[in-house]
Amino acid sequence: MVLSEGEWQLVLHVWAKVEADVAGHGQDILIRLFKSHPETLEKFDRFKHLKTEAEMKASEDLKKHGVTVLTALGAILKKKGHHEAELKPLAQSHATKHKIPIKYLEFISEAIIHVLHSRHPGDFGADAQGAMNKALELFRKDIAAKYKELGYQG
């Protein structure tokens, strides 16, 4: 899967808006993930006790993790598909330590698309959504290949 330069520009244009409020976007994305797919919460020992959206919004740990997730994803997106160096340690930790299934990466991708559309409707129309979907699919495909190299079938 290859994105055109124009598609990468659409992705990076909306990502600049994410970077203007990484903590807020990260928090919204994780809350959306956990509400839409409660089973994903079980992978996070430090968040398992958060049962309501209000508890999630009040959690500084959740907000910090959102920043970590989006900072890593931003570094990958900015490489425009040439993300081997950034992807390798991420795949290693997610496959061997955290045991995060690829399906959960699909779930967070859905949450990212939803939050970006709801927060930036003017900058995240059909073309930008399509480009971001392709970029996230490329990320998932490449991380799945790394998982396989590591012997994790996630």
Swiss-Prot record:
In the Enzyme Commission scheme, what number(s) does this protein have?
Answer: 1.7.-.-, 1.11.1.-
Q: What class of enzyme is it?
A: oxidoreductase
**Which GO molecular function, any one, fits this protein according to its record?**
oxygen binding
Q: Which residues bind O2?
A: 65
- Residue numbers of Phosphothreonine PTMs: 68
Q: Does the keyword Protein transport apply?
A: no
Which residues are heme b-binding?
94
Q: How does it assemble?
A: Monomeric.
The protein, known as: Myoglobin
Q: Which organism is it from?
A: Physeter macrocephalus (Sperm whale)
Q: Which gene encodes it?
A: MB
